[in-house]
């Protein structure tokens, strides 16, 4: 008989001491109560730096399953670049160093372009400051900043303050000068609106647009300007504005586009680097630039260097189990199927050898408060059958209810969702015990543990609360301070397999 291990992920199930807002506490959960009382149980981190996100940021299903399957903290781009700037790795980044060396060799200018805010969705202003410091430390003085103004991921009229802050920081560093500002409406289009992008390009290359000697003042003036629809021109819509006495982007120069999210960085980048670009006429033809994308915007993008290349996750749990000849099953309903397959496998779509997958259709309802049971029962039927078949070494199972119903903000529905999961967990446990296997019970992030905001309104987001980790079917001791990336090393320990060096997580079982 195979050495069976089942990992059951209760999506959106966090531990929250505040009972009044907590659908999990309000639910009747005899099976979970029994597990948490009788079996080795601890809390593990599922948010912030524990999963490669900034401190205090809630986790999500994609990040959670990626970290579980990888067996290591997988840093998201914002955190990855911030960490690189803080620990000095940025100074050694080949693409960034080469861009600066190009300017030194040719006596040309360095242009830093990107979203000028601390929103952290597309960019972060701290990354800009780090780049200016790096270029200054490497001996450059001609450093020009082309700021795309936000107003979506930060307040709509905050750009003037960001410009003031940037100017103060540049004065402190002793380098860096704002050369162009414009709303992201122009510089970060993603719908092939080439008339807008053309205006951005004209300002950056030809110096066409509103002329000013004070970027912040020009933006504040924009706030008082009404467009043809009768709306004030807030940050997102500020017209392309050129600061007098600054240089334009020209052949021989280096450009570093410091946005890390690809979707809104592709179009403006293509105007500079694609010889076949035909969205509008580039007067004078394509410029000869040393162009660096902060991350990979598009694998087919020509004539660019990439500063932070995609992370290749070698030896994820699924890949490693396949290599060891073990059989595995991934099972979830539609809403979480990609999470137990694609994300759990580190962004790899293909099935590994001896990896089976079962997809159960999620119910077709407008919102899941209308059917909080979702498809948990049919998922449970199929997984119990798979467990008792004796066919699998490892089964990865997800119950979607606590998360998907939690997002509706309907407290009573979330309670029903939790109770449904409790019933299913009890059935899965019975099947695992029948086969003398081991079950690990956990979650990827919180949600149903907080359904009411401080002001009394429905709370529909994820939480930053820790999640459970329980071991059913084996007596053992668990350490504190674990996180999601420690689950795969724990699984390998239980299976008696050596941990691959790529997995830097540590088993939660101490004996």
Feature map (PLM): residue ranges:
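Feature captures the catalytic ectodomains and active-site-proximal regions of enzymes
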Residues: 1-511
